[in-house]
């Protein structure tokens, strides 16, 4: 297990999500009014999804950087973020000769459903199938996948169910494959509190609240999930614009309701979800990452290491790194992606 030290961004001690939520509530009576640290300057050019392609149920908006014949890396963002999590990572990888694809997930940015009749489905198998559909549309037989949050889950699923399509994997918070059956089981009270937003979305009030206060809600999640990340207003606004997608709220609410068994998926994904419910091992070369100040719910590395049965390394990013390592520690994330591709090419290697 490796530790990567990042220059500290704050002298504040890391607090878990629960502590930050309760502190904000006690201080002001309103979680949205949690104090924000002094912002850092935004100097990174935006990552523009200037390409569009029909892929499965979607017309996917994506950025495409680097040489057309370079080794392909697909970078997958999470909720409630967007492709600009990779605004520094993607150009650095492209400069090293990789072809880098960064798509907006369904319900984000310029990605749209091709039919008004398609269910606005956020179940994990659907999101992962979007990655395969994109690869097929772009005629990409194999790629290295890297992601965090929802993006890491999709990358995990693709690596588990379609290993022949994956050269290597970089997954923040490791093994995130689960099932509705697991989601129905109650957790200890402290763990349940960390998932407060999931239960909020299970209510009509939660859907209405997220619809009305999407940007405020997203900012609160950013602050809670990365309590020592000094993002500024411009950085947040650049990503928040992607949440104005007309299908965003529906996708997010369905995703979290599905996890609890409160919403059904689509029949065409049922067989995939049955496979995922067996918690399949991931055999492709993998580097997992965790930030030492991740305030979002996440598993401990020792709990999931055994799910990766191929070449494997784990890295902890120290120095106040939270839930969004590619944006909070881009150089270290770039190195992890490069090293994962090297694991894939090596005959021997780590386990």
What are these regions (language model features)?
Residues 128, 253, 330-334, 338:
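Short, amphipathic alpha-helical "lid/cap" segments that border enzyme active or binding sites
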Residues 321-329:
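Catalytic histidine-centered segment of alpha/beta-hydrolase-like enzymes
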Residues 34-47, 58-60, 65, 72, ...:
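Flexible "cap/lid" subdomain of the alpha/beta-hydrolase fold that forms the substrate-access gate
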